[in-house]
Amino acid sequence: MSSLYFDNYIKENKPQFKAKVDSISTMLSINPDWLLSVMLLESSINPQAVNKYTNAVGLIQFMPSTATELGTTTAELYEMNNLQQLDYVYKYLSRYAGKMNSLSDVYLSVFFPAAVNKANDYILQTSSLSAAKIASQNPAFDIDKDGKVTKAEIESFLQNWLKKKRLSFPHD
């Protein structure tokens, strides 16, 4: 069951949303807090969040090409509420079911799928996207400032980010 520290970030349909996140997480065999953490980092758990640079939309920042692969558009995703959009979150992440063994694997499924289940020294890059470009576009991930981002750096960033977030959550 998902943690209470995400409650303040879920703006609508809170009980139904949490129940659906729990259900999706069970189907994907992942911790629901991992999924909520990724949505919090990507969109502040806002289904109408839009990245002004990439036009990515929604809870996990669906790129236009990804939306098309999933049989929808970013415009349609933008019009959906949080419950409706979770169907597409599941549809997208189901591609990686059985491969997501950590928070970083869930995050990388969204941010850089080729890195899922790779060794910690795996450098994020492709034949058309250099390690240096990824590092320059995502400086928070290049922790050692060496012009490349490794899976270990993503893991470190996520753990530090999560610790900071937990410190800012209200305590019961």
List each language-model region with its residue ranges.
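Catalytic glycan-binding domains that act on GlcNAc-containing polysaccharides
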Residues: 2-144, 151, 155
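Low-complexity, Gly/Ser/Thr/Pro-rich intrinsically disordered linker/tail segments
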Residues: 154-172
